[in-house]
Amino acid sequence: VVSAGDQIQTTKKKSPGKSEMTSEIEYTGYLSPDVLKSLPVATTVGNHDADNANYTYHFNTPNSSDLGSNGVVGGDYYFTYGNTLFMMLNTQDTNAAEHKQFMEQAIAANPNCTWRVVTLHQDIYGSAEHSNEPEITNLRYTLVPYFEANDVDVVLTGHDHAYSRTHILEGGHKTVEYTDDEFDAELDKDMDAGENPATRYEAPANISTDSKEPADVAYLNYLNAVMDKDAIEDTEKGETVVNPDGILYMTANSSSGSKYYDLVPRMQSYIANRWQEDVPTYSVIDVTDNTFTINTYRTDNDQKIDETFTIKKGVTEDI
C-alpha cells in the first residue's frame, strides 16, 4: 500500500497545544484495521504529518536519507518492488536540490530498475482547490526538471482529496510571477474554497473570464499560464501511451472519506481525466517489464472511475 501523505488531520494550527496527543490518537486509528497488520505500507509525509515527530514513531522507512528532512520528521527514502524503484520525497522540505541529490543516489544504487516512480504529497499537477496555488506551482517548476532529468516515469501525489490524471507532460516551466496573497484573495472571490458540500463536486467560477478588474485579469492570466499547454506530449493512443518521453502525474482522492475538496471550475489543459463524487477511491497499479497500468475504483461498489491507463515502453508494436 502506497500513501501520498496526510495519514492524519490534526495540526498545531488546528489544535494548538493538543496536536501531539490528538495526532497520536489519529495514527492509532489509521493503523487499527487488521488488514494493515499483514500488508507492507509505504507512506509519504504530508503537511498534516509534518509538524510533530509522531509520524516517525509509526513508520520504519528503508534506505532513509537525511536529504529532504524538514527537521521534525525524516527525510526522503526509497525502496524497490519487483522491477520498480519507488522514491518517496518529503516535500515539506522544499529544498529541491536535496531531493535531486537523493534521487540521483537512489537511481545510482538501483540502475537496473525498469520503472522509476516518485511519490510526494503536494499535487503539483492536480485539479482541485490547492492545485493552482503559487506555493504548489512553484514547487512544480523547481522539481519537475529534476524528475525529467532522472527519467522518472510516474509521479504519485495527494493533498487535494480529489482524483486526477494528467496527459503525459514534459517541459513545463514558469512564465508568470504571482504571489500566494494575490491568489488567496482572488480564490476567495472565485470559488468559495474549502471543504465542499456533499452535493457539489465542482466549484462554480464566480469571476468572469471577461472581467476588466486588474486583480481579476492578473489572476486569470496566472491560471492560464499554469495550464502548461505546451508541456502536453502527443504520444497518447486511446488510454495507452507508447514510449513516452514525459511523465504521468496522478493525484489520489481520499481513500478514507474523511475530507474532500472541490474540483476547480476551469479544468487545466494538462488534465486528461478527473473525478470527484465524495466517495473514497483506491488505485491498483500493475507492473510488468514493458507496461505500467493503473486502474482506480470507488470503495462503495468497486466500479472504475477512470479508464484503464497503461504506459508501454521498450516496445515497437503499433497499437
What are these regions (language model features)?
Residues 2-11, 110-130:
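Short acidic, glycine-rich surface-loop motifs adjacent to enzyme active sites
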Residues 118-125, 155-163:
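Histidine-centered catalytic micro-motifs
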Residues 1-3, 43-44, 118, 156:
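Residue-level marker for buried hydrophobic side chains located in beta-strands
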